[in-house]
From Swiss-Prot:
Protein name, UniProt field: Auxin-responsive protein IAA1
Location within or outside the cell: Nucleus
Post-translational modification: Phosphorylated by phytochrome A in vitro.
Gene designation per UniProt: IAA1
Organism from which the protein derives: Arabidopsis thaliana
Region Disordered, annotated ranges: 1-74
Length: 168
């Protein structure tokens, strides 16, 4: 232990390394550049393969993991209802036809749709289900065959019956 003028300088000395390490390493510092690559004293003639990477728990983030592992058989669309303060998402691939979809929407938002006729639209209800297709046009749910609807639907909106005829 080095003591100078009664001071213990060894304890307050700043050095690189882990705390409590007693080994002192001599570092070579030079300002001379060489064209040679650094020499690795630890390497042997035979280079060992790098160790296998282990996956850290919680990595990758859940969001990107969900995107990568996303099931390709789903088709989520946003559903809004006039007067409801929130939006929902539903998977159109879960339903096989319009009656199943409308029943699910009725249960989700607690309303009734009524009967659909091609000439008059939806009768007997204060609400009309509409959807936005890939072209950005708003159409009545049930106007096109189910397969075409499920592939082109971008958003669903349950409009008040009084607003639907003027908007479409």
């Amino acid at each position: 232990m080095e003591v100078t003028n009664g001071l213990n300088l060894k304890d307050t000395e700043l050095r690189l390394g882990l705390p409590g390490a007693q080994e002192e390493q001599q570092l070579e510092l030079s300002c001379v550049r060489s064209n040679n690559k650094r020499k690795n004293n630890d390497s042997t003639e035979e280079s060992a393969p790098p160790p296998a990477k282990t996956q850290i728990v919680g990595w990758p983030p859940v969001r990107s993991n969900r995107k990568n592992n996303n099931n390709k058989n789903v088709s989520y669309v946003k559903v809004s209802m006039d007067g409801a303060p929130y939006l929902r998402k539903i998977d159109l691939k879960m339903y096989k036809n319009y009656p199943e979809l409308l029943k699910a929407l009725e249960n989700m938002f607690k309303f009734t749709v009524g009967e659909y006729s091609e000439r008059e639209g939806y009768k007997g209800s204060g609400f009309v289900p509409t959807y936005e297709d890939k072209d950005g046009d708003w159409m009545l749910v049930g106007d096109v065959p189910w397969d075409m609807f499920s592939s082109s639907c971008q958003k669903l909106r349950i409009m008040k019956g009084s607003e639907a005829p003027t908007a479409l």
